[in-house]
Amino acid sequence: LNGRNKILKLKKTTIFDETYNASPESVKACINNLLDSPNNHFLIFGSMQELGSESKKYHKDIFDFINRSDIKKCIFICDRNDEIYYADYLKKSNKFLFFNEITHIAETINKYTKKGDFVLVKGSRNWQLEKILKLID
């Protein structure tokens, strides 16, 4: 199935393509797989959808997990309404960048990565993160 357990070796980076969907458990499992790789680790994380009233709690749990990890930079994609809430929570961390759409994400991650780095791309289907894979170096 496209977007699940797919590894793409590109000219500069290796991409873990997990773009098909996201749940709190699968995000943590994929981050752990990423961290087993050598060199620098980056995450492109589209917000998880359909979590109901627990959504903010689940996202905060993932953010704490990322903050405690070796991930150099996390590009987080969320709706504008959620950005205000999450930005306030994450402003003390320099690991996170916020976007409301996928337009400039590949360009941004390409500025941070160097040869041999690893990038995990994970998020809910509605973000269509697979569209940016071919734009990452």
Predicted regions mapped to residue ranges:
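ATP-dependent carboxylate-amine ligase
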Residues: L1-D137
